[in-house]
Regions:
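Conserved class I S-adenosyl-L-methionine
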Residues: 1-34, 42-46, 65-68, 125-150
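A short glycine-rich, Lys/Arg-flanked "PGG" loop and its adjoining helix->strand segment in the class I
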Residues: 110-125
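Conserved Class I S-adenosyl-L-methionine
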Residues: 40-42, 156-248
């Protein structure tokens, strides 16, 4: 289960990529905007503020997240619905689809992008941001520490060049780039607290009691060695992939 309060820690660092993505979306009028993996809805709300004339729909499969998002709803202008991205299909063509840090949870990106392209209306736009730090120490140490206890999903995020090729093959114009953010996180065991909000969630759901506490202690020790805390905080490099694809 998603923990909205845990995810909201380091809010500034987590939301910055969204606004970097937003800055590259063609600034024109959109009638229907869909935010896939809307979470607590705060960034969906930002889309509604940026394009006040549009109907904005946030989609998420987590009841916990949607419970928080519902407080922001403005029926007919800003709505939230429960659905799984892997099965989502709009009732009508969409002008702008935004997927901020959500596609990494969905398998088979080639098929996924085909469905997204099919959902776009004329001159429609697909804007995506995904973490691509699965070879970073935080993830490598997670795999090593949990080995044999909990099966972990394989990294399904593709090289950025592969996304360009797939999207161009679908007839879309593509603007793609990568960014490595150098976050300086504050607080004790900051990287552990960060990962608890995302990649660590399935592991914590699978373990319980003493086994869970033993895992957390071992993982925290390894993270402290890989990411030493300094008087200024803990430096945490985080690579992300972005692309904005437009129907010609």
């Amino acid at each position: 289960m998603w923990d909205a309060s845990q995810y909201e820690k380091f809010r500034g660092e987590r939301t910055r990529p969204f606004f970097d993505l937003l800055s590259r979306i063609p600034d024109r009028s959109y009638q229907v905007i869909v935010d896939l993996g809307c979470g607590t809805g705060d960034l969906t709300d930002a889309l509604a503020e940026h394009w006040p004339e549009a109907r904005v729909i946030g989609v998420d499969h987590s009841e916990e997240m949607l419970k928080s998002a519902a407080e922001r709803a403005d029926p007919g202008r800003l709505d939230f619905v429960k659905d799984d991205i892997a099965a989502w299909k709009p009732a009508q063509p969409v002008d702008l689809i935004v997927a901020n840090a959500s596609f990494q949870w969905v398998a088979d990106h080639e098929s996924l992008l085909g469905r997204m392209a099919a959902a776009l209306g004329p001159k429609g736009v697909l804007a995506v941001q995904m973490p691509a730090n699965f070879e970073s120490p935080s993830h490598v140490l997670l795999k090593e520490t949990v080995a044999g206890k909990v099966p972990l999903r394989h990294d399904i995020v593709l090289p950025v060049g592969r996304y360009v090729a797939i999207l161009q093959g679908l007839g879309l114009h593509v603007d793609a780039w990568e960014t490595v953010y150098q976050h300086v996180l504050q607080g004790k065991d900051a990287v552990l607290e960060w990962v608890k909000g995302t990649a660590l969630r399935p592991v914590l759901e699978a373990l319980a009691g003493a086994e869970r506490e033993e895992f957390l202690a071992a993982y925290a020790t390894r993270l402290r060695a890989a990411y030493p805390e300094t008087p200024s905080g803990t430096l945490f490099a985080f690579r992300r992939i972005f692309f904005v694809a437009t129907r010609r």
